[in-house]
Design a protein with these regions (language model features):
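Short beta-strand immediately N-terminal to the catalytic nucleophile in serine-hydrolase-like folds
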Residues: 108-110, 135
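Short beta-strand/loop motif that positions the catalytic acidic residue
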Residues: 156-159, 163
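Conserved alpha/beta-hydrolase "acid-adjacent" motif
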Residues: 32, 164-170
Length: 213
């Protein structure tokens, strides 16, 4: 992944925060897409977080964190694990360049493809991460990660019953997979599509806040 390490936006005050959050947007979107929501969440947390939102590189005129899955001639899903790992490595290098306080708690999170990236980093990032928030996403390359230990034990997941982009069944399979890796999973689900609602916002803000304590 050819990531521009200077292309990111932030919320909050780095020097006055108790928590660092790195947030990954969805496929075809950009880092401004969740900025309003994350501002509201940080307000609910009394501005306790410093939030960093990088931009995925453009691939065929759409921003993408890693190679999208394809299907073979038998309609079987093909996932590019090496491409995904290259993206995780690029994000690790991005985090290195931020020169963050190593004593600060670090959370990763994202929406849709960004959520999938965050979940994969929960297994393979070289950084110490205390939590992962995955909204409307899925567990990529689960067959390979089945052989790996998870390093991030606290996970927040949300999904809508009516999601057509990443169907609820994919969430259920991902949740079942992750429950075999950790007992510390909080979920927030409801009657919505490939988006989030106010309940998810409130639940996520509460979960973030608990990571500070």
């Amino acid at each position: 992944m050819n990531l521009n390490n200077n292309d990111f936006i932030t919320i909050g005050n780095k020097d006055e925060s108790d928590l660092i959050i790195i947030w990954f947007h969805g496929y075809g979107s950009n880092n401004w897409s969740f900025e309003p929501t994350l501002k509201v969440i940080n307000m609910q947390m009394n501005e306790a977080a410093y939030i960093i939102m990088p931009n995925a590189p453009l691939v065929n005129d759409k921003r993408s964190w890693y190679p999208l899955p394809t299907k073979d001639e038998n309609n079987q899903l093909l996932e590019d694990y090496q491409g995904l790992q290259a993206s995780v490595h690029a994000i690790d290098n991005f985090i290195d360049g931020l020169n963050l306080d190593v004593d600060m708690k670090l959370i990763i999170g994202g929406f849709s493809q960004g959520a999938a990236l965050a979940l994969s980093m929960s297994f393979s990032s070289r950084h110490k991460i205390c939590g992962c928030a995955a909204l409307s996403g899925y567990m990529p390359c689960a067959k390979i990660y089945e052989k790996h230990d998870i390093s991030v034990m606290d996970i927040f997941m949300s999904h809508g019953y009516e999601d057509k982009a990443i169907e609820y069944d994919a969430f259920q399979k991902s949740l079942k997979f992750l429950e075999n890796k950790t007992d510390n999973i909080i979920t927030s689900v409801g009657n919505f599509g490939h988006t989030i609602n106010q309940q998810v916002v409130n639940d996520l803000a509460s979960w973030f806040g608990q990571r500070i304590k």
